[in-house]
Amino acid sequence: MLNPVVTVSIFQKQPDPKVFSAGQVIFEEGQSGDEMYGIIQGEVNILVNGKIVETIETGEIFGAGVLVGVKSRTYAAIAKVDTKLGFLDEQGFLFAVQETPVFALQVMKSYSERLSRLQRMV
């Protein structure tokens, strides 16, 4: 079974990952978005109201909410270290879900686990 980041990398339209330097903003809380990400290499801080609530690492995915109906980003994402990200837009996401249904389950699991962790912090 493919890990979700490998799936993202396979189905992204552009062959090259997005590269972010340590401290660089990937997206802001409240910003609209049209891509989800998978960490190929590096670490990303997840912030809510300017506070780091989680650090995610190589092999994890994030940002899928905007592809499944959430209108704007519910958190900010900032590269903690130099980071390479695979990414999918909505069309690529839907194709990946259709071609590899396990990917959809992995995305739902990641999304629900992150939501549960964030709710426990409130």
Per-region residue spans from a language model:
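Cytosolic regulatory regions built on CNB/CRP/Popeye-like sensor folds
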Residues: M1-V122
